[in-house]
């Protein structure tokens, strides 16, 4: 089927989502980071589900790669914001300092005292954290 023919209705079938995919409404939102929507189309009926990654699965080798501008930082921001909203702890390593500035806006006032920012380049407030202290 040629894609350049005018006045043709094309239906593209995608594979259905896996049966154990964590979806909104079927999974505990505090245990899933929702990150997108499926694009499953069956005949003329669209079935789109909001899906995510289970927190226990995120503990194992989650690797986000892509070229500039494809949304790697936005995906991380989405997951971190959900973790903060559900009261989970977060550790962010930000070599440029821009990501943490965006995230600080989403920390509730009652939790702001729990935030610890370690900036090795800050000469006014040097860090007393020594990762090699007990090595």
Name every feature range the model reports, one short phrase each.
Residues 12-15, 28-31, 41-44, 69-71, ...:
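A short linear-motif detector with a strong N-terminal bias
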Residues 47-135:
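Switch/coupling segment of Walker-type NTPase motor domains
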Residues 36-43, 50-53:
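Walker A/P-loop-proximal flanking segment of P-loop NTPase domains
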Residues 1-39:
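An aromatic-glycine-centered, glycine-rich loop/turn in mixed alpha/beta architecture
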């Amino acid at each position: 089927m040629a894609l350049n023919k005018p006045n043709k209705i094309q239906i593209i079938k995608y594979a259905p989502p896996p049966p154990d995919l964590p979806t909104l409404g079927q999974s505990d939102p505090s245990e899933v980071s929702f990150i997108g929507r499926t694009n499953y189309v069956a005949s003329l009926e669209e079935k789109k589900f909001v899906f995510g990654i289970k927190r226990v699965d995120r503990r194992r080798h989650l690797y986000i790669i892509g070229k500039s501008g494809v949304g790697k930082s936005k995906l991380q921001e989405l997951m971190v914001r959900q973790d903060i909203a559900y009261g989970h702890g977060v550790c962010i390593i930000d070599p440029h300092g821009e990501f943490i500035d965006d995230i600080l806006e989403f920390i509730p006032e009652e939790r702001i005292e729990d935030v610890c920012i370690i900036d090795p380049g800050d000469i006014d407030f040097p860090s007393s954290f020594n990762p090699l202290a007990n090595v």
